[in-house]
């Protein structure tokens, strides 16, 4: 069972490793160089996070499993989300192992594996604040989103929708 789990993890990681194509090395190049350079983010628990100054989480566990079977070194670097995809697109890393919303713009630069996790997006308000109960009630309000997030790029779409609906 442990060996088959390792094989499954290896296959999943290898699929992810070559899912980003922008300036990323392919398998023969990685084998020749002897190292797969992987970027993960620093604050996306339970997938990627720091624990006492060390990488931790599900993705670290997957990379540890890959290290058992790969014929090359696996070098994990922890980056803030805001620079993660740019670092892969410029060739500093062979792949990113992280959660990312698939957008048309990102598809022009990256290849993605099939999803293996999903996340929901919510708007959050202060407890007891009854002024915000629908998306429409965001009209005229200041909103914040994560820097580098695909949701940031969708704010003009939200603004247009709110202007149209009043």
Language model features: what each stretch is:
Residues 144-165:
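Secondary-structure junction motif
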Residues 126-143:
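Flexible hinge/capping segments at coil-to-helix
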Residues 1-9:
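Bacterial N-terminal signal peptides that target proteins for export
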Residues 18-24:
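Sec/Tat signal peptide C-region and signal peptidase I cleavage site
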Residues 9-17:
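Bacterial N-terminal signal peptides
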Residues 73-80, 145, 163-166:
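Short beta-strand-to-loop elements that line the ligand-binding cleft
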Residues 25-99, 108:
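Extracytoplasmic small-molecule ligand-binding "clamshell" domains
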Residues 104-117, 160-165:
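Ligand-binding "clamshell"
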